[in-house]
């Protein structure tokens, strides 16, 4: 089985490839997910959207334009059309012919490779419909041990938990709540994903003490260097939190960088 959500208490660390190894491969494709695992990741973060015919595809944007040779909203096209699109050539011509995967495709891959998936729901207008279909797919493929469900919308996460208590939920935060533990407990949240520029060791300590897993989202190393140029060297703090088992996961686009950090902690 993949690493548990609360990896730190087992002396482990989840290395999560954000949209797969998206620094070097076309994001949210099986190619990028496998590349992440090959580079040392044990988890991949993926994003879900609904097609016009209520099928779940793995894509980040509401529109097709940035990552495929298609155009328009994902919600305005049927699955058959989206599966015909090229999801690799815009990133690099070497990856021409890469396709947009479905949720089912990705779950089957995760089970075959024993890789954990951080599944982010990206469908604010049809969130309830997405949740229902997502849970049905997870039940059909018996994939509960391989996933946690994440979102910026913590009310949606509470609904996921109410409908399927076996699912673990991970709240994404871009702010710092006054009482982060109370806020997460109110939604029955199992884990929290925190941005580096809002990350404080004291919050991680409080969350771990409360039994809530902590995922730290890291920028690309060249962006992290901008903190250093501004007089803030954050690497010792990150390494210290990993070493002291205050962080269960590191997530980012550059799996090589995440691995380097984890090995130097």
Q: Which stretches of residues belong to each language-model region?
A:
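Phosphate-group recognition and catalysis centered on beta-loop-alpha active-site segments
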Residues: 1-265
